[in-house]
A protein has these predicted regions:
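Conserved RNA-binding domains used in RNP assembly and mRNA/RNA metabolism
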Residues: 2-94
Length: 94
């Protein structure tokens, strides 16, 4: 049995390849009102899902973008996540 290598969704910009990911992350929840102990204990972070190309991943941050210029090295729809908030990264297959 010959196993095929997985092909992942990616783009090439200025000779650099960027891969498309599903990013699952914990979002901070804040409330400036008064609350009881019971209400406070019920607070939880929101589990968020974002999709984008990974621009850079370091020990401290994950940088993503979702839009780009087809003729220039220019990025839009950008996000930067603290790595401590990242729960899961999934590379998207074609």
């Amino acid at each position: 049995v010959v196993k095929k290598k997985a092909k992942y969704q990616s783009i090439l910009i200025n000779k650099k390849r960027y891969y498309f990911y599903k990013v699952t992350w914990a979002d901070i929840l804040g409330d400036s009102g008064h609350a009881t102990v019971e209400e406070f204990n019920k607070m939880e972070t929101a589990l968020m899902i974002s999709y984008g190309y990974i621009f850079e991943k370091t020990k401290k941050h994950l940088k993503t973008f979702a839009s780009f210029d087809s003729k220039e090295e220019c990025f839009s729809d950008r996000n930067i996540y603290p790595t401590g908030c990242i729960i899961k990264l999934e590379k998207i297959n074609i």
